[in-house]
Amino acid sequence: MRLVIAQCTVDYVGRLTAHLPSARRLLLFKADGSVSVHADDRAYKPLNWMSPPCRLVEQADGETPVWVVENKAGEQLRITVEAIEHDSSHELGVDPGLVKDGVEAHLQALLAEHVELLGAGYTLVRREYMTPIGPVDLLCRDEQGRSVAVEIKRRGEIDGVEQLTRYLELLNRDSLLAPVAGVFAAQQIKPQARTLATDRGIRCLTLDYDKMRGMDSDEFRLF
């Protein structure tokens, strides 16, 4: 991973245009090919980013370097670097990934075993289906053979919806899978998370862990 702290302007050129005026920012260039631009707020969310695969070309506009990040669709992030305060590269190695807590891992196993709880005619394609940013819990097919990505949480919060949204964005770029729908499944889903999921066309499924362990009933609340 390459970390750069620089005074820079950033322009996105693609389906839309967006401009970030000159400011000190953190630029992350990851080994997977992704590039993201961060400020000292917004928590983990970047100001702008380019998902992999993409390539970086360093050009010059007079004496000012311009780093052009371009994806396969021809969209570009044009980073005009006015001054560099820090530039370092670090080898992080292969990450073992997020280890789910016991309840989430068991929920995933139970739902994979009884995938029909997602709906009549559903079939499991794979557990822990890998994407460039991590594994989605379940990849399934619905009764019409369409792809469905399922993210499972013990407590359904906005972060989980954002995580599934990023998975869906990447999965829908795969012509062998697209279109890919999303299901956000949890024991309890907070109202704000449900509202965000609904707005993004993601279906919410409330799971009863005790019933799933005993499988005494097929009745689940589906919203």
Swiss-Prot record:
Gene Ontology annotations for the cellular component aspect, listed alphabetically: cytoplasm
Gene Ontology molecular functions: DNA binding; single-stranded DNA endodeoxyribonuclease activity
UniProt cross-references to Gene3D superfamilies, sorted A to Z: 2.70.180.20, 3.40.1350.10
Superkingdom classification of source: Bacteria
Pfam families: NucS_C (PF01939), NucS_N (PF21003)
Keywords: Cytoplasm, DNA-binding, Endonuclease, Hydrolase, Nuclease
E.C. no: 3.1.-.-
Cell compartments where the protein resides: Cytoplasm
InterPro entries: Endonuclease_NucS, NucS_C, NucS_N, NucS_N_sf, tRNA_endonuc-like_dom_sf
Function text: Cleaves both 3' and 5' ssDNA extremities of branched DNA structures.
Family indicated by similarity: Belongs to the NucS endonuclease family.
NCBIfam families: PRK03298.1 (NF002876)
Record HAMAP family: NucS
PANTHER family associated with the record: ENDONUCLEASE NUCS
Record protein name field: Endonuclease NucS
Species this chain originates from: Mycolicibacterium gilvum (strain PYR-GCK)
